[in-house]
Amino acid sequence: MTEAQRHQILLEMLAQLGFVTVEKVVERLGISPATARRDINKLDESGKLKKVRNGAEAITQQRPRWTPMNLHQAQNHDEKVRIAKAASQLVNPGESVVINCGSTAFLLGREMCGKPVQIITNYLPLANYLIDQEHDSVIIMGGQYNKSQSITLSPQGSENSLYAGHWMFTSGKGLTAEGLYKTDMLTAMAEQKMLSVVGKLVVLVDSSKIGERAGMLFSRADQIDMLITGKNANPEILQQLEAQGVSIMRV
């Protein structure tokens, strides 16, 4: 029996029982305890089950991670589409834009694809899409591949400063009167290096993120040139941001 076959049977057991012990896996598959634990570890790392003491349990109500293939399933998809369309209208022919990772970033890249603009990105799903669609000018920022975010990250003191664009579009997990928050520290630090060399910083977040504070402060409010968000965004937070010079667009 191959590893793939063992994994399939193990997942079927979990679908039926909800929980299995290492002993039960050994008995059902006819393998050693060490092999059973190794299989459980691999499936846990891939997010297909949850490893627990002496066994594994099924993952319930798991929301699928979006990809360019299931982009329509992204949270607040319709609002993000409107945000991306509005953002794309800001860019003039011949300008360059920096686009980072996430569902809104991909939607923005899709809107700009085919237009006479240079797109700079470290987000591989977007880069692959642009290349596949034969977009004329794509710059892929180099670095080490980060699997969890599907991006490349350059080491400390790298040449990210060379990638200066007229516009930088980015998102985050929350936006308050203090500024934009991101939860992935490595991604945030890599992007922060570019803030001093881009022309304008535009934050793209759906209305559910307004007023939320999560992770590290990526950029202060006074560093943000424009915010594009949904019509249901907290008006009090928007007023506080406007008072600090942030231009607000609600779509």
Swiss-Prot record:
One of its GO terms (cellular component) is cytoplasm. It comes from the Bacteria. Residues 20-39 bind DNA. The keyword Transcription regulation applies. One of its GO terms (biological process) is negative regulation of DNA-templated transcription. It is found in: Cytoplasm. Keywords: Cytoplasm, DNA-binding, Repressor, Transcription, Transcription regulation. One of its GO terms (molecular function) is DNA-binding transcription factor activity. Residues 3-58 form the HTH deoR-type domain. The keyword Signal does not apply. SMART domains: DeoRC (SM01134), HTH_DEOR (SM00420). Represses ulaG and the ulaABCDEF operon. This is HTH-type transcriptional regulator UlaR. It comes from Escherichia coli O127:H6 (strain E2348/69 / EPEC).
